[in-house]
Design a protein with these regions (language model features):
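Core catalytic alpha/beta fold that binds nucleotide/phospho-ligands
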Residues: 1-196
Length: 196
C-alpha cells in the first residue's frame, strides 16, 4: 500500500502544525488506498472539509468518506451513495465513573464493576459507535454522541437514519463504522459502504 502522498494532500499537510503532518498524511494515504479499491475513479479527487470539518470528495457529494486516528491507529470508511462515519479509539487506562455515566447512560451500572482495563476497553467500543454515528450525520460533537444509546457488548445497532457496526470480531482496537440507511440523491449504483 505504500505510495507517495497525493499532491493535494501534501499541500494541505504543509499548512498543518508539524506534529500533525505524519498523522494527517497516513490517514489520507489509507483513505486513498481504500478509494482505489472501491471507487477508483475518485482516488485522486481533492478532499475538502465542509463547514463542520467533515471530509468530502470535491465535486462528489454522493460518495461519503470518513477518517479517524488515535495514536498510531488509523481507520477510514468510504460509502458509495451513503454518508459514512468511522471512529477508532485506544482505550484509556483510567475511566472515571462520571465519564461512564455520561457516555453509557443507563448502561453505566453494567460497566462500573469491571476491572479498570475492561472499563476502558468497553467505553472505547461504545464511544467509537457513538462517534461514528455523529460523524456520519456530519454533526461531530455538537450532535451529542454520548446521548446515543449503545449497550455495552453490542456489535450493531441503529440511531435515527444511521446503522452502526462495531468490528469487535475483526479488530483488537475499538473500531466502529456508521452509514446512512437512505441514499444520497445521485446516480450511484446502489448502496455500498466499506470500512477499513
Amino acid at each position: 500500500m505504500r505510495q507517495a502522498a497525493d499532491p493535494n494532500d501534501r499541500a494541505v499537510a504543509a499548512a498543518l502544525p508539524r506534529r500533525r503532518t505524519a498523522e494527517f498524511l497516513a490517514g489520507r494515504s489509507l483513505l486513498r488506498h481504500l478509494l482505489r479499491l472501491t471507487v477508483p475513479e475518485r482516488a485522486s479527487t481533492p478532499i475538502r472539509a465542509d463547514a463542520n470539518g467533515r471530509p468530502l470528495l470535491d465535486g462528489d457529494p454522493a460518495t461519503g468518506i470518513s477518517i479517524s486516528h488515535d495514536g498510531l491507529a488509523i481507520a477510514v470508511a468510504v460509502g458509495r451513495g451513503q454518508r459514512v462515519g468511522v471512529d477508532v479509539q485506544l482505550p484509556a487506562p483510567h475511566v472515571p465513573d462520571s465519564l461512564l455515566h455520561r457516555c453509557l447512560g443507563r448502561h453505566a451500572q453494567d460497566v462500573i464493576p469491571l476491572s479498570e482495563h475492561r472499563r476502558g476497553v468497553e467505553l472505547a467500543w461504545v464511544w467509537t459507535a457513538q462517534e461514528a454515528c455523529v460523524k456520519a450525520a456530519g454533526t461531530g460533537l455538537t450532535g451529542s454522541p454520548w446521548s446515543i444509546d449503545v449497550p455495552p457488548g453490542s456489535r450493531e445497532g441503529q440511531w435515527g437514519g444511521y446503522r452502526w457496526i462495531s468490528l469487535r470480531d475483526r479488530s483488537h482496537t475499538p473500531l466502529s463504522c456508521a452509514f446512512s440507511l437512505s441514499r444520497f440523491p445521485s446516480d450511484a449504483d446502489g448502496l455500498e459502504a466499506t470500512c477499513s
